[in-house]
Amino acid sequence: DSKGLYGVGYSQEGTFEGMFRANWTTGDIDLMADCHGDTYDVLPTNDVIYVASHAHDCSNIGGFADRSNEGVYHHAVGFSSTATGTVRSNTASGYSDYAGLPAPTQYNGFLPGFENGNYTGLSQAVWTVEGNSQYLVYGGEFIAVNGTKQQGIARFSMSGGDANAAQPGDEGGDNGANDDGKQDKKDKDKKDKKGKKNKQDDWDNQDDWDNQDGGWWW
């Protein structure tokens, strides 16, 4: 888009895993989501950057910690489109260090859980992400989303609330810092004294999550 050139990668074919954006004029990297885990596709829209991946460690930018030893991977991840800090020094073995580069915020309210499929035999879930200002579509070989059977394609409304799995433990369905699934479900209907939804469910501190109204995915 007009902000720059977006790219994603995985370390088997290079030195970086995650998402980056380079300035059109200078070529300098002005945003880097240094999240370990193969990343396959990227979509910037509505001031949020979405990736298709199997990310398992975004701690280098202050995001979710590595739980790959528990089988927790995040296949759909959203980031702010502006830098909110810098990449931390890498301490994980086998990865390059990008400390000091501009880093976005990783949104813990957008971590829907996809269950791996077996079509390619590569133990993957999503391969692509597409969309516009109203809808977000993930495609791949997954066989369920948030514990509900759904194969190969899932559409998310840009006007939804928390997109995470209702129950922690669904494949890739970890809710980050908000991982008490039963409480999340209960809290969705709670409102404060002014009649607004709890901000913990408005993951971008807006009305719903994109300053619109409506539900999440079909």
In which residue ranges do the predicted regions lie?
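Extracytoplasmic surface signature
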Residues: 1-179, 190, 216-218
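Composition-driven, intrinsically disordered low-complexity tracts enriched in small residues
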Residues: 174-218
